[in-house]
């Protein structure tokens, strides 16, 4: 399935279910890395759209990310109930789009950031999300999930961003999990390939299950998966 010419997207569940748009991180066209998490979300009664996007393109992935939002909204039967979730750099993009949602004519139900790399620039706007909070209008709530064992993006990044969101009037919840940078998204880092891949080891399954539960709660789905 393509959300734009040459740009692939995986769809899980039924569009009548609450919809989560899930963005992977910096790794180019890496929708497969969050496959396990997307499957767990679908098992919990959610529909999930997972696009490829290219953070190394000339526009930092902006056109990919915005086109995927349009596609997910057109696919979902409740486009204004969209939950936006992103991992690492994808989490920064999700936060940036949420802060600027009104400028894009968007209504989001909730935003979930997994190990958000908030110390780097938002790939959509090319600016620091935190610097834009002062002029933003608080809207949809945030859930920030970060692993205490993350040695790629320190948990301090989410702590600081959570504080900034709250100071600007946004509804935010920060949860620090027993997780690392990969398994919080159902993935693991393969050193020999210098890339993340989906993982199915018991610890990753446990962490991804916890994360899926929090995303489901953000989407208003509370039954066990």
Say what each PLM segment does.
Residues 70-132:
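Primarily recognizes the serine-hydrolase "nucleophile elbow" in alpha/beta-hydrolase
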Residues 57-76:
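Alpha/beta-hydrolase active-site loop
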Residues 27-38, 53, 156:
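The serine-hydrolase catalytic nucleophile loop
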Residues 115-168:
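The feature captures the conserved acid-bearing segment of alpha/beta-hydrolase catalytic domains
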Residues 1-15:
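N-terminal cap/lid segment of alpha/beta-hydrolase-fold proteins
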Residues 42-57:
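Conserved alpha/beta-hydrolase
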Residues 168-225:
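C-terminal catalytic histidine-bearing segment of alpha/beta-hydrolase fold enzymes
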Residues 17-25:
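Short beta-strand element of the alpha/beta-hydrolase
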């Amino acid at each position: 399935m393509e959300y734009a010419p040459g740009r692939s997207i995986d769809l899980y569940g039924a569009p009548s279910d609450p919809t989560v748009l899930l963005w992977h991180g910096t790794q180019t066209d890496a929708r497969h890395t969050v496959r396990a998490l997307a499957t767990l979300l679908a098992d919990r009664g959610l529909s999930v759209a997972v696009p490829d996007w290219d953070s190394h393109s000339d526009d930092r992935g902006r056109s990919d990310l915005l086109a995927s939002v349009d596609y997910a909204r057109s696919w979902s039967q409740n486009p204004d109930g969209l939950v936006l979730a992103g991992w690492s750099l994808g989490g920064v993009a999700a936060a940036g789009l949420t802060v600027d949602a009104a400028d894009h004519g968007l209504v989001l139900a909730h935003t979930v950031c997994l190990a958000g790399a908030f110390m780097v620039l938002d790939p959509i706007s090319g600016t620091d999300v935190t610097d834009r909070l002062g002029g933003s209008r608080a809207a949809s709530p945030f859930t920030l999930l970060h692993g205490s064992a993350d040695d790629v993006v320190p948990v301090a990044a989410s702590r600081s961003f959570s504080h900034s969101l709250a100071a600007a009037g946004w509804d935010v919840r920060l949860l620090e999990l027993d997780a690392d940078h990969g398994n919080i998204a159902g993935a693991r880092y393969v050193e020999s390939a210098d890339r993340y891949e989906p993982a199915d080891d018991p610890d990753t399954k446990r962490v991804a299950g916890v994360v899926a539960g929090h995303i489901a709660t953000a989407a208003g789905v509370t039954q066990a998966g």
